[in-house]
Amino acid sequence: ARRIAAYKVNATWFSCNQEPPETSEFDLVENAHDVVLLAARVDHSPWYRFVLRHADRFLVMARRDSRPSKPFPLTADDGARARKFRLVDLVMLHEGAHSGRTAEWMDAIDAARVINIYNDACVDRLARIISGKSIALVLSGGGARAYAHIGAVKAMREAGAPIDFICGASMGAVVAACVAMGWSQEDMETRIREAFVASNPLGDHVLPVVALTRGGRVEDRLERHFGDALIENLSLPFFCVSSDIVNGTVRIHNRGMLRTALRASIALPGILPPVIDDHALLVDGAVVNNFPTDIMTTLHRGLTIGVDVAREGVIDIEAFRNPPGFFSWIASHGFTAAPPIISLLMRSATARRVSLDMPRPADIMIAPPVPGVELRDWKMYETAVADGYKTTKAAIDENWAALAPIISAAGRKL
């Protein structure tokens, strides 16, 4: 309660197993407070049923060495508003013996995200989430232009803006995963340089049958840097998106092997082979949703910041005017240079669609122009990072009134 109060939120709470108040009495309490916390044990008591009916959001708290009851008494039949709007979070308390039961809990309660409590900073994050003062960050796809996201994260960290929930599509998912792993700015930049800047991650070309590259370089680098990390065990709540081209829908990856989810999210059709998951064929998230602000604003109650680097794509039109044949291209450029078809496929996958159902915008929209950086300009790291930093720093200054109370409370020793 003390941590929530730091965010200037008028909150009250009801303890476990008390007699449910009359509806009119409870309405008065809700109208008089910003946040009303209802604490309950999972049982079949009248109080627990009251909580299920009235809660707008569920925070199911569990120890990592515990098992959920099956079936868990939190189903669509309960008619709970939180279930309707998918606002069910798992708060995993890392106490007791180690176990791998987080995914089991997520399945039991159909959790949208996991809030892991590893240390005191995680408790502060939970306080921001409960008070509606948390900050979520959405990172778009954009190939090498997504390096700008690294500069955006740097600007937010320097300003003291906490990142409490993060997601991304395509290359934006990779940068988001770096943040969710809890890596420092220096560590993140070192790893991105090694994985994508030092040598072309899409350089293992083959004669195209399924794709223009084998995908082996990308898979090796994802395994080297992310190992066997599971999404549900990350320091920050995280998800990324891929596109299921069997049924044309978005796949939300919020649990399971992180590197597998990232491999699906960056599988540009025709460039990287797709990822097969049971009866699904998963390709780059950018194909269906390159900027998943709509998903984030559904799951998140707080301030959402979106960084979109795909608004102003750069592509060399002259490369497609009277293009040479295959052998003429090889004679002029050798086997190491990427042919124009790669730029064409990448741009086709990440081009913004103009439609009536565009994703809901973030509260703060940041669009680094990233001038002169093409989607496959993997060597243009410094230029893209600098532009992302500069644009985000300016956006923070412009939106200081909205950010200052959160930054001030987050930086205060509670």
Each language-model region and where it sits:
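Walker A/P-loop phosphate-binding motif and the immediately C-terminal alpha-helix
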Residues: A1-E22, V29, M171-G172
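Patatin-like phospholipase
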Residues: T23-V35, A40-C167, A177-L414
